[in-house]
C-alpha cells in the first residue's frame, strides 16, 4: 500500500514537472516572439539614426524578409515539428530516425539546380520571368504536398504514405530554396546586398517560429486543439509572403544565356545548363582554395554547437536554466548578431569582415572552455551562449553574403546551390568526430580542440586574401580577376569534380544511415577516388 502511494506521488511529481516544463517552453516561445518583434520594430528607428543601418528600410531588403519566411518554414515542419508529432502519436524512436533522410535533398540540391537556372516553364516564364515562374510553380506543389503530409495520419506500423509525402515535401522545399536564393541575389543592389541577406535570415527565423511553436500551438489540445492535419494545412499558407514579395519586386536581374539561341540542340542545352555553370566557377583563379575555405570556415563553430547540449547536461544545469539561457537570451543575441553583420561588412569590407567574424567565432568557443572549467555557473553559461549566438549571427550574415557574392549572375541558382551544399557538408561531416573528441579529452580539452579546428579555415582564408582572391567589395565575381586558366577545364574534369562532391556527400550520409554504413562509405570512397582519377586522366581543354 505504501509502495503504491509512493509510486503515485512520484508519478504526480513527474507529471507536474512535465507540465511545468511544457508551460515554460510555451512561455519562452512567446517571449522569443516578443524579443524578435521588438528587434524588427527597432531596426527602422536605428536605420534613421545610423547610416550603416539605413538599407534595412529599403524596398528590396524588406522583400527578402518576405522571401525568407517562405524559405524557413518547411524545414522546421519536416524536422522539429514532425518529430514532435510522431512522438506524440506513439511512433518509436528508430522509425522517427528516418527524418535524417529528409535533409538529403537540401545537401544535393545543386544536382538539379541547373534546371531551375535554364529550363523555361511553358506560359509561366513568359508572364512572370524565369525566377518567379519557378517560384510560383514550386510553391503551388509545395502547398499541396504539405496539406497531404498533414492529412496522411501517421500511425505505428502505417508510415508509408506519410514518409512518401515527407520526402516529396523535402524535395520541393529544397527546390524552393534554390529559386529563392537565386532570386534574392538577383534583386538586391550592391549597397543593400548584405542587409538583404540579413533580412532574409530574419525572415527565415520567422518561418522557423511559425512552423515550430505556431504549428504545435494550432495542433495541441493545450493550444487551439485543431489537430495536426489542420495545423499543417494552415502553416502551408506561409508560402504567401514570398508570393507577395515576388509580385512586388518584379523579375529581377536574371540573365538568360539562351535568349540568342534558337533551336538549340540537346547537347548544346546540356552543355550550357549543366556543364558551363561548374566550368565557369572552376576556371576562376583560386577556385579550389575557395571551395576548401567554404568547406572549413565554420567547422570549429559547428563542432561546438553539436556538443553544447550534452555538455550542459553533463555540467548539471537544469532544463529550465538551459531553456532560458539558450532559447531566450541566446535567441536575442543571435538576432542582434545577424542584424549587426550587414553594417559589419559596410564598415570593414568583405575581406576584413570574414577575418574578424572568423576570429570572433573562435573566441566564443574559448568562452565555453571557461564555462567547462568553471562548472555549474548560470551566468557564465548565459555569457558563453550569448557570445556564441552573437558571433554566430554576425558570421552567418557575413558568410552568406560572401557566398552570394561568389555566384555569377549568369548561373546564380546552380553556383549558390553548389556553394551552400559544400558549406553544409563541411559543417556536418567535419563535425562528426566531435563526440569522440569530447569523450577522450574532456570538455575543456574539447573546446580547445574546436578552436584549433577553426585554424585550417582561417589559414585558407589568409591564402585567398594574400593572393587577391578575396576582395573588400561584396560581389567577388566582378572584382576578382576572372580570366580563364591557361588550360580551361574539360568536361571529364567537371564530371570528376561532381563525382568527388557526390562521394563526400556519401561519406556524410554513411554516419546517420546505420543500416548501410559500410556499404555507403565504401561506395562513397570509390566515387571520390574515381572523381580524382577522372580529373587527373583528361588533359584540360576548353569545351
Outline where the language-model segments fall.
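C-terminal transmembrane helical hairpin of 12-TM major facilitator-type secondary transporters
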Residues: 354-398
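Intracellular loop-helix junctions on the cytosolic face of multi-pass helical membrane proteins
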Residues: 7, 20-58, 150-164, 175-176, ...
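C-terminal ends and interior cores of transmembrane alpha-helices
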Residues: 136-155, 360-375
Amino acid at each position: 500500500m505504501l509502495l503504491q502511494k509512493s509510486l503515485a506521488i512520484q508519478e504526480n511529481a513527474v507529471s507536474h514537472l512535465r507540465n511545468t516544463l511544457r508551460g515554460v517552453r510555451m512561455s519562452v516561445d512567446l517571449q522569443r516572439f516578443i524579443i524578435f518583434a521588438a528587434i524588427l520594430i527597432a531596426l527602422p528607428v536605428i536605420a534613421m539614426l545610423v547610416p550603416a543601418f539605413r538599407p534595412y528600410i529599403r524596398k528590396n531588403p524588406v522583400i527578402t524578409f518576405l522571401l525568407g519566411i517562405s524559405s524557413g518554414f518547411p524545414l522546421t515542419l519536416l524536422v522539429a515539428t514532425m518529430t514532435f508529432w510522431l512522438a506524440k502519436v506513439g511512433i518509436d524512436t528508430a522509425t522517427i530516425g528516418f527524418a535524417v533522410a529528409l535533409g538529403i535533398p537540401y545537401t544535393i540540391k545543386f544536382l538539379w539546380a541547373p534546371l531551375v537556372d535554364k529550363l523555361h516553364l511553358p506560359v509561366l516564364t513568359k508572364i512572370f520571368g524565369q525566377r518567379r515562374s519557378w517560384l510560383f510553380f514550386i510553391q503551388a506543389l509545395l502547398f499541396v504536398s504539405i496539406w497531404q503530409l498533414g492529412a496522411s495520419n501517421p500511425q505505428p506500423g502505417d508510415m508509408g504514405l506519410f514518409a512518401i509525402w515527407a520526402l516529396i515535401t523535402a524535395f520541393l522545399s529544397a527546390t524552393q530554396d534554390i529559386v529563392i536564393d537565386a532570386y534574392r541575389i538577383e534583386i538586391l543592389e550592391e549597397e543593400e546586398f548584405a542587409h538583404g541577406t540579413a533580412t532574409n535570415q530574419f525572415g527565415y527565423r520567422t518561418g522557423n517560429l511559425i512552423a515550430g511553436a505556431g504549428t504545435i500551438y494550432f495542433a495541441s489540445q493545450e493550444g487551439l486543439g485543431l489537430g495536426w492535419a489542420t495545423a499543417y494545412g494552415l502553416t502551408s499558407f506561409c508560402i504567401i509572403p514570398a508570393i507577395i514579395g515576388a509580385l512586388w519586386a518584379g523579375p529581377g536581374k536574371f540573365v538568360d544565356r539562351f535568349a540568342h539561341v534558337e533551336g538549340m540542340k540537346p547537347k548544346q542545352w546540356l552543355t550550357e545548363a549543366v556543364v558551363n555553370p561548374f566550368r565557369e566557377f572552376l576556371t576562376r583563379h583560386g577556385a579550389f582554395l575557395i571551395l576548401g575555405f567554404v568547406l572549413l570556415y565554420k567547422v570549429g563553430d559547428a563542432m561546438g554547437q553539436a556538443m553544447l547540449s550534452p555538455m550542459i547536461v553533463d555540467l548539471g544545469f537544469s532544463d529550465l536554466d538551459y531553456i532560458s539561457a539558450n532559447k531566450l537570451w541566446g535567441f536575442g543575441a543571435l538576432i542582434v548578431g545577424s542584424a549587426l553583420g550587414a553594417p559589419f561588412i559596410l564598415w570593414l569590407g568583405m575581406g576584413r569582415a570574414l577575418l574578424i567574424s572568423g576570429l570572433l567565432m573562435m573566441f566564443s568557443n574559448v568562452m565555453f572552455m571557461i564555462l567547462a572549467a568553471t562548472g555549474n555557473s548560470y551566468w557564465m553559461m548565459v555569457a558563453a551562449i550569448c557570445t556564441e549566438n552573437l558571433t554566430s549571427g554576425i558570421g552567418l550574415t557575413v558568410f552568406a553574403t560572401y557566398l552570394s557574392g561568389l555566384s555569377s549572375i549568369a548561373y546564380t541558382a546552380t553556383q549558390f546551390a553548389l556553394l551552400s551544399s559544400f558549406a553544409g557538408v563541411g559543417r556536418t561531416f567535419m563535425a562528426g568526430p566531435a563526440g569522440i573528441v569530447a569523450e577522450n579529452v574532456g570538455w575543456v580539452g574539447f573546446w580547445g580542440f574546436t578552436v584549433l579546428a577553426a585554424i585550417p579555415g582561417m589559414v585558407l582564408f589568409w591564402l585567398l586574401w594574400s593572393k587577391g582572391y578575396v576582395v573588400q567589395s561584396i560581389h567577388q565575381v566582378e572584382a576578382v580577376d576572372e580570366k580563364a586558366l591557361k588550360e580551361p577545364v574539360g568536361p571529364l574534369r567537371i564530371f570528376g569534380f561532381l563525382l568527388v562532391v557526390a562521394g563526400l556527400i556519401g561519406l556524410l550520409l554513411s554516419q546517420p544511415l546505420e543500416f548501410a554504413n559500410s556499404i555507403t562509405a565504401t561506395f562513397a570512397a570509390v566515387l571520390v577516388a574515381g572523381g580524382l582519377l577522372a580529373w587527373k586522366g583528361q588533359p584540360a581543354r576548353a569545351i
